[in-house]
């Protein structure tokens, strides 16, 4: 049920994904979904509780984190891959205040705060927030808006442009890249 809910919230957002839709995918009655989760809001909270964990990206050299994070967004399918994508679930659910609050909590608790602790140093929280903002902006422009330069650009070219900016937040130093 959770896998189906995650995929639906990614594809349709909170407002357009329903308990009946989840039940139909799984092949059960909607009452069973309610029995297990209590409400659509609780199903949503449980479905998106995981997904923002930066743990895997924090493994490896600190000097390569910007590139690893850029790739995490840019190598995803352009559009819907059919599975759970916490970035797209957040973007598509943001118009609903309660859903946005739940996602914001998850993002802060599972991504921004752990990343800030890992980054350390001056203004670590702001730097972690800026990294998250950049990643969400990339995901939004590439997968939702489908802006031509980002949606059709070569992954390696985009990573080469984005990674130094993200790395500057990791290092706590202004980016030295200049547009050409």
Where are these regions (language model features)?
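Helix-turn-helix
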Residues: 4-42, 46
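Alpha-helix C-capping/helix-to-loop hinge sites
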Residues: 8, 54-55, 76, 93-97, ...
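Amphipathic alpha-helical segments used for helix-helix packing
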Residues: 48, 78-110
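Phosphate-rich cofactor/ligand-interacting catalytic cores and adjacent structured alpha/beta frameworks
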Residues: 51
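Hydrophobic alpha-helical connector segments
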Residues: 54-88
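Short alpha-helical scaffolding segments that buttress acidic/His motifs in well-ordered protein cores
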Residues: 73, 87-94, 131-135, 139
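Hydrophobic/aromatic-rich alpha-helical bundle segments in the mid-to-C-terminal region
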Residues: 100-108, 116-169, 173-180
């Amino acid at each position: 049920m959770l896998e189906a809910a995650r995929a639906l919230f990614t594809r349709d957002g909170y407002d357009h994904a329903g308990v009946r839709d989840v039940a139909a995918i799984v092949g059960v009655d909607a009452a069973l979904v309610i029995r297990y989760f209590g409400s659509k809001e609780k199903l949503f909270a449980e479905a998106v509780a995981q997904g923002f964990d930066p743990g895997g990206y924090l493994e490896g050299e600190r000097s390569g984190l910007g590139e690893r994070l850029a790739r995490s967004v840019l190598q995803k399918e352009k559009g819907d891959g059919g599975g759970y994508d916490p970035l797209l679930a957040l973007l598509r659910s943001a118009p609903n205040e309660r859903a946005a609050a739940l996602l914001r909590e998850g993002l802060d608790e599972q991504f921004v705060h752990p990343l800030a602790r890992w980054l350390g140093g001056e203004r670590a929280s702001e730097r972690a927030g800026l990294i998250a903002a950049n990643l969400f902006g990339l995901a939004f422009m590439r997968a939702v808006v489908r802006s031509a330069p980002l949606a059709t650009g070569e992954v390696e070219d985009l990573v080469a442009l984005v990674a130094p900016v993200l790395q500057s937040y990791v290092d706590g130093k202004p980016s030295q890249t200049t547009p050409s």
